[in-house]
């Protein structure tokens, strides 16, 4: 008799969200189904970006990967405070950006 393997399907905390035809290289979106929030990732080595008035006031943080690479993460759609406690624990926007950066750095950046 064949043994059945059980697999627990869990909602991922972060997903890479891409608009392939519209997004130039150096930009990605990260979506969090737990917090119903969207983050824009800007690779600053390849993109020089001046944030408009709307984006300047959104929560953002700069992460330095190494001496050549740095990334700016900006919360574009922010439901972190509204959804905290429902699908995930309550956290600050800075903690949310740090967790998103950790996920992005681990899964999307090729370490050399």
PLM segments and residue spans:
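Short, mixed charged/polar active-site loops
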Residues: 37
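Short beta-strand micro-motifs enriched in acidic
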Residues: 41-45
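Negatively charged, low-complexity tracts enriched in Asp/Glu with abundant Ser/Thr
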Residues: 1-33, 46, 52-61, 66-94
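Acidic, low-complexity intrinsically disordered segments
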Residues: 84-112
């Amino acid at each position: 008799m064949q043994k059945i393997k059980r697999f627990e399907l869990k909602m991922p905390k972060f997903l890479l969200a891409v608009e392939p035809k519209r997004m130039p290289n150096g930009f990605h979106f990260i979506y969090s189904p737990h917090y119903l929030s969207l983050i824009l990732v800007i690779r600053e080595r390849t993109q020089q970006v001046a944030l408009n008035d709307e984006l300047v006031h959104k929560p953002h943080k700069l992460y330095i990967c190494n001496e050549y690479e740095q990334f700016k993460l900006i919360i574009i759609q922010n439901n972190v405070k509204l959804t905290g406690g429902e699908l995930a624990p309550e956290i600050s926007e800075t903690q949310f950006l740090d967790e998103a950066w950790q996920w992005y750095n681990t899964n999307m950046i090729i370490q050399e």
